Amino acid sequence: MLFALTIAFYQVPKIQADLSENYEEIRIHNTKVEARLKDWIHRAKSHAQALETSNHKTIARWRKQMQHIQFKNEAEELQRLNSIINDDVVYRDDYTHFHKKDFWADPETTLEEGGDCEDIALLKAASLIRLKWPHNRMHLLVGYLTERGKAESHAVLLVENRKGEQFILRSITNDVVRPGHFKFTPIYAVDGEGTIIVKPPKKN
């Protein structure tokens, strides 16, 4: 019954969507990347209760802010959530933080201690799931940022709205943009279903 109600909730009237700016996607499998995401999901679930009960000031503020933005329209939820997390979470690179080259921290750790671009993007995904966004509309997108004069490894959260239009939640700025609207070369995305080779949208 609950499953049926959930499906019904997401059955909205068809609205003309602009998919021309979406990334092109080719579904593949990368066992290493998918294992890392599976491990992150396991750790995130094990820390879920702490997010609801912790008195840490950043986590308590995050809970309160999530309540304030829930049930707003999709565009407003994305913009508010992106600004909240970017403003609250301190950037810390993995080598300084964990003494590892690359590590995906769980949401509790990221809120309490800060994190790098992957950690921040994954925290945004966990926050959207808390706001009842379906997990299959979110992807961790990895590539190279080129807007600062050189290619830098970077990751962001790629989200699809109910019409199937893709949006990127930036972390260097608070902007929520369509693919191709900032200088970023995508390589791959990963979600609960596997890995996706991502290509920039075709130009008309």
Task: Give the location of each predicted region.
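A structural boundary/capping signal
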Residues: F9-N204
